[in-house]
Amino acid sequence: ILGNQDEAGVAQLSDMGAREFARELAAYCRAYNLDGVAFDDEYSNSPDLSNPWLARPSAYAGSRLMYECKAVMPEKIVSLYNLGNMYSSSLQVIDGIEPGQYCDYAVADYGGAAGPGTGMTLKQCAGMSIELRRGSGNSSESTARSRKEAGYGYYMFFALDPSLYSSQVYRCQSVCKGLYDETLIYPSYYYKKNSTQREAIN
């Protein structure tokens, strides 16, 4: 969930706005059986502070939205991509509830590792954020193994590009070996966008 070049940014809703938006998100998550929501504070315009749904951009506003989401859908994942006003390290205690109770996972921006906020552990943090299209982020087996041994809970891959298929699979295989000591099997088929038809990989 991220901005859309308008005023309704994820870290600039009022308490009321956060509460109502959380209810709407919960309805979508349940209707479409989604795992949950992930917030990314970017691509938002400055808010009109005369609008009661909006507030000044802040870590508090972002924390409030995550808290409200967890309150209204405790069975769903509420996670965070560290950017803008929303970083795991700057999440705030809301109504006596620590971030570790309303933020399930946190992931850093390109090529980094997330740090735990108040009440969080490294297990709730991604040890690496790997952007496959640009090739950013360390995907070596040794780094994956060391991050796992340090206590990080997961890795994040994003921005897959079919035109770079072979190199992207290789990077995933390397990380898999470091995290699980297993070999990721090279796929033999794929699906084109919006298709349910298997296509053989040549």
What are these regions (language model features)?
Residues 1-202:
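Secreted glycan hydrolases and related glycan-binding modules that recognize and/or cleave
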